[in-house]
Amino acid sequence: MKAIHFGAGNIGRGFIGALLSKANYEVVFVDVNAQVIDRLNEQRSYTVLTADEDNEENVIHNVRGLNSRTQMEQVLAEIATADLVTTAVGPSVLPHLAHPIGQGLLQRNGAPIQVIACENAIGASSMLQEYTKASLSEEEWSKVDRVTGFPNATVDRIVPAQDHADPLTVSVEPFYEWVIETKSMKGEPPTIDGVTYVEDLTPYIERKLFTVNTGHAMVAYLGFQKGLMTIKEAISDQTIAEKTRQALAETKGLLVHKYNFSPEAHDEYIEKIFKRYNNPYLSDRVERVGRNPIRKLGYNERLVKPARQLLDLGHQPTALLAGIQAAFAFFVEDDQESMELQEKRQVQGLEQTVVEVTGLPAVHPLVQMIVGNN
């Protein structure tokens, strides 16, 4: 079996590619990074380290790479004979994959295939499906659509900043979760150990977004506000830890209301998340976790979405509000979005910036709360 994976970065190698290799797929990584691709082709393997006290070493075999800048014809040919296509490139890169994926799928012999976007965004595979459809004629899309599933997925594994002699080596936390929705598949689901298949992904997407991502953002933005350097330092601060717990209690109430999750099971999930944040071997910098604040303060994102939905239910998102306000003050010179955010504040003021970034009207109570308490 062969999987084509777009994105040979840390998540691609340390999570998706590693699981696919262990499931007996030959993994063909596609990336623009010539150094990584050349190294993959030289070594045909790489090492994944577990970021904990055991520091377990796993060698991932049966891998190679293609440079999408210089080897696009080969990329299309590989898609034509693949059993699975996956991505981990970042949501903003997905539009650029539509043309090669569409053209590669057109060359196939009619065997069913799944294209799974493993991105930190809701409905990423559906987005990729729309981009791919737009890149093809109606007749071409009809041919592709008959045998190609674009099942949505949610992925969760913290990959800390890396510093290894071998640029292919990657450290990852022990915990991971990869959940794939079955209802939009064509043909049988791929057999991959460690993957959970569900009929409806929405509850699992929001559980992760409103817990893992919300909590991570709270710790990062509140930690930055206090001048702390790492997630470990920030979560060790009693005030920040308590405020983050309060925020996750707020989102827990929302998730239990919307999806009937077991409150006890969700409490266990939250404790697992806190254990991950406290892992000294992950020790990510708050500046890195907090980057791209404009995206992370979006209407359907980790802080604003649960806060506005709680207000709709008549509940006050007090702790979430603290995280949102801290995010609007986030500024790191080498992060383009945080620089843009502070520029907007200086030029047009906080209220107009909040309206623009969150997509909420100025009269919305959440906008007034963000502006009023600053």
Swiss-Prot record:
One of its GO terms (cellular component) is cytosol. InterPro entries: 6-PGluconate_DH-like_C_sf, 6PGD_dom2, Mannitol_1_phos_5_DH, Mannitol_DH, Mannitol_DH_C, Mannitol_DH_N, NAD(P)-bd_dom_sf. It catalyses: D-mannitol 1-phosphate + NAD(+) = beta-D-fructose 6-phosphate + NADH + H(+). NAD(+) binds at residues 3-14. It comes from the Bacteria. It is an enzyme of class 1 (oxidoreductase). Keywords: NAD, Oxidoreductase. Belongs to the mannitol dehydrogenase family. Its EC number is 1.1.1.17. One of its GO terms (molecular function) is mannitol-1-phosphate 5-dehydrogenase activity. This is Mannitol-1-phosphate 5-dehydrogenase. The keyword Endoplasmic reticulum does not apply. One of its GO terms (biological process) is mannitol catabolic process.
